[in-house]
Swiss-Prot record:
Optimum temperature is 50-70 degrees Celsius. This is Ribonuclease. One of its GO terms (molecular function) is RNA nuclease activity. One of its GO terms (biological process) is negative regulation of mitotic nuclear division.
Length: 12
Protein backbone atom coordinates (compact mmCIF):
# COMPACT_ATOMS: atom_id res chain seq x y z
CA UNK A 1 0.00 0.00 0.00
CA UNK A 2 1.28 3.45 -0.89
CA UNK A 3 2.05 5.87 1.98
CA UNK A 4 0.21 8.71 0.29
CA UNK A 5 -2.79 6.49 -0.32
CA UNK A 6 -2.74 5.42 3.31
CA UNK A 7 -2.54 9.04 4.45
CA UNK A 8 -5.45 9.93 2.17
CA UNK A 9 -7.49 6.95 3.32
CA UNK A 10 -6.74 7.58 6.97
CA UNK A 11 -7.36 11.32 6.60
CA UNK A 12 -10.74 10.77 4.96
Amino acid sequence: VRPYLVAFYESH
